[in-house]
């Protein structure tokens, strides 16, 4: 009584689940139950899940031809280890003679792509649009089409990438800079000979005995022309204002900037507006004595190749011999005057 009251209070209990129709089975059936005998007893049957063997396929074809493609439980009784569902799927997907096994045409492929855009992955519904094609065949061929399209797109991208890079013009190289005139500064270090220094062994190691000259060379032709014109006019090519060497600190003049040396230098070159023909008449003896280099000058005119330092004075003529400006000699090393 109490049970009936509780049932009426909470409502009627849910109805028992309806029994499955004949010929339909669950997907994951491992043990299949069948009704047999007059007492309605239940008998269990173990089903195999392995691949279908050729002997099983041949026997299934014979049973379908004998019982028809609808009595799958009856057919499964004749196949040991196979269920009715397994026999049905094997028949409709692989063994049915109505299956179209030909390759998909271009028209069918276009219809398949359009149907997939419309219905998605509902392969059973799409297979109804292709008579003779199973849902598995339609699904597998759609994946084949997608893989083919992906390969074509990736291949076209790989072919287009090198062509686009090669089509771009390479940057033109920058033009070379215009040539600039080259001005070479030659630093010549001359040593006094024995007749000017008075000693031979110490002259080579004495740094103060060397003289520094800066030769501004524009071209070999202009230098040769200047030397020839100076020799014809009995005037040295370059005159240097002599500076008395009062102490050993005068060697710093060799290390001074070349600007200071150039300020004390008066140079004459051909073509600079100087009349070499009138030079001997125009120059006064005092000017000649002022600019004439002495034997102990801190700066000396560069001698020619293979000539002693006294060759410049010989070419200078009377200007070198009539040097009235006498420089006192200081014997710092104690070797004596010559």
Swiss-Prot record:
Compositionally biased spans, kind Basic residues: 150-162
Induction: Induced by wounding.
Keyword match Calcium: no
UniProt record, GO biological process: regulation of DNA-templated transcription
Sorted UniProt keywords: DNA-binding, Nucleus, Repeat, Transcription, Transcription regulation
Transcription is among the record's keywords: yes
Region: Disordered, residue numbers: 1-25, 150-184, 298-322
Pfam families: Myb_DNA-bind_6
Annotated Pro residues bias: 170-181
DNA-binding region: 72-94, 123-146
Knockout or disruption consequences: Reduced plant size, and reduced levels of sugars in anthers leading to defective anthers and male sterility when grown under short day (12 hours light) conditions. No male sterility phenotype when grown under long day (14 hours light) conditions.
Transmembrane segments: none
Domain HTH myb-type: 44-95, 96-150
Single GO molecular function: RNA polymerase II cis-regulatory region sequence-specific DNA binding
Intracellular or extracellular location(s): Nucleus
Cellular-component GO terms for this entry: nucleus
Tissue-specific expression: Expressed in root vascular tissue, primordia of lateral roots, leaf collar, and veins of lemma, palea and pistil.
Biological role: Transcription factor required for sugar partitioning from leaves to anthers during male reproductive development. Required for the production of functional pollen grains. Binds to the promoter of the anther-specific sugar transporter MST8 and regulates its expression. Regulates the expression of genes involved in sugar partitioning in flower, such as the sugar transporter SUT3, the invertase INV4, the UDP-glucose pyrophosphorylase UGP2 and the starch synthase WAXY.
Name used for this protein in its record: Transcription factor CSA
Organism: Oryza sativa subsp. japonica (Rice)
Source species taxonomy: Eukaryota, Viridiplantae, Streptophyta, Embryophyta, Tracheophyta
Gene that encodes it: CSA
């Amino acid at each position: 009584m109490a049970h009936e009251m509780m049932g009426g209070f909470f409502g009627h209990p849910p109805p028992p689940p309806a029994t499955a129709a004949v010929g339909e089975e669950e997907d994951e059936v491992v043990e299949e139950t069948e009704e047999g005998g007059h007492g309605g007893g239940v008998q269990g049957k173990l089903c195999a899940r392995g691949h279908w063997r050729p002997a099983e396929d041949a026997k299934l074809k014979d049973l379908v031809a004998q019982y028809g493609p609808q009595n799958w439980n009856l057919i499964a009784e004749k196949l040991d280890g196979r269920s009715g569902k397994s026999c049905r799927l094997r028949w409709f997907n692989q063994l049915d003679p109505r299956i179209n096994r030909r390759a998909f045409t271009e028209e069918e492929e276009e219809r398949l792509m359009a149907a997939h855009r419309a219905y998605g992955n509902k392969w059973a519904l799409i297979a109804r649009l292709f008579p003779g094609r199973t849902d598995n065949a339609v699904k597998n061929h759609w994946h084949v089409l997608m893989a083919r399209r992906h390969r074509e797109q990736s291949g076209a991208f790989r072919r287009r990438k090198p062509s686009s890079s090669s089509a771009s013009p390479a940057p033109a190289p920058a033009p070379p800079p215009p040539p600039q005139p080259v001005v070479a500064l030659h630093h010549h270090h001359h040593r006094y000979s024995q007749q000017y220094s008075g000693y031979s062994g110490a002259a080579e190691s004495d740094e103060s005995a060397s003289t520094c000259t800066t030769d501004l060379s524009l071209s070999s032709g202009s230098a040769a022309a200047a030397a020839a014109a100076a020799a014809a006019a009995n005037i040295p090519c370059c005159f240097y204002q002599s500076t008395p060497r009062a102490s050993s600190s005068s060697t710093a003049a060799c290390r001074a900037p070349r600007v200071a040396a150039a300020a004390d230098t008066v140079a004459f070159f051909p073509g600079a507006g100087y009349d070499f023909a009138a030079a001997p008449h125009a120059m006064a003896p005092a000017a000649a004595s002022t600019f004439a280099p002495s034997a102990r000058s801190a700066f000396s005119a560069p001698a020619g190749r293979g000539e002693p330092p006294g060759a410049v004075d010989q070419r200078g003529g009377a200007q070198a011999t009539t040097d009235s400006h006498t420089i006192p000699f200081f014997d710092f090393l104690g070797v004596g005057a010559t």
